[in-house]
Amino acid sequence: MKRVSIELLEREASTKGDKKSKRKEGLVPVEIYGKGVQNIHAYMRIKDLAAMPHGTTFLIEAKLGNEVLPCLLKDIQYGWLGDNPVHVDLYNISNVTETDVEVPLEFVGTPKGVELGGTLEIHLHSIELKVDPRNIPEKITVDISNVDLGGVLHVKDLNIPANCRLMEDPEEVVLVVAEPEETKEGEEEQAQEAATK
């Protein structure tokens, strides 16, 4: 799993005006909470937040004073325009042995069915797993090159690491390679003709 190191700045109880002033300085308020630990109020640099990986799971090593806290990114709240972070929640995993996480799926290869004119329809882009937070997989790689026309890939078909517990319905559909419309129409016409004979 990827690790990202950030440095936090201590934050005393502050007013709305104080927080607004800090945002102008390139800082965003952070709340750190977790099992059996005291909540911590801090600030982090917005540029550090922007530099964090996207589309993968990662561990944050948050340095506050002389202490380094292992954390997961739980939530980012944005302003009404949707592009300005106004608050960040980090989950301190120091005392956690298992946690639920969303792990992204990475699809590799071109399905056989797509090469034959089918359409790839992806229903799930991530799955929920229960795992030791220190061993969270960055992603689950899924080879879809053998999925044929009309083929369906279910959650149970995924290669889940042995140290993870699946929290999804095994029968849930991950993706489908739909047949071309003309093929469907032709099959329907044949069925209608057969029914009238």
Curated annotation (Swiss-Prot):
Please tell me whether the keyword rRNA-binding is annotated for this protein: yes
Q: GO terms for CC?
A: cytosolic large ribosomal subunit
What gene codes for this chain?
rplY
One matching Pfam family: Ribosomal_L25p
Q: Which domain of life is it from?
A: Bacteria
Q: Which organism is it from?
A: Hydrogenobaculum sp. (strain Y04AAS1)
Biological process (GO) annotations held by this record are: translation
Family designation: Belongs to the bacterial ribosomal protein bL25 family. CTC subfamily.
According to its UniProt entry, the function of this protein is described as: This is one of the proteins that binds to the 5S RNA in the ribosome where it forms part of the central protuberance.
PANTHER family, sorted? RIBOSOMAL PROTEIN L25/GLN-TRNA SYNTHETASE, ANTI-CODON-BINDING DOMAIN-CONTAINING PROTEIN, RIBOSOMAL PROTEIN L25_GLN-TRNA SYNTHETASE, ANTI-CODON-BINDING DOMAIN-CONTAINING PROTEIN
Q: Which UniProt keywords apply?
A: Ribonucleoprotein, Ribosomal protein, RNA-binding, rRNA-binding
Protein name according to UniProt: Large ribosomal subunit protein bL25
SUPFAM superfamilies for the chain? Ribosomal protein L25-like
Q: Does the keyword Transport apply?
A: no
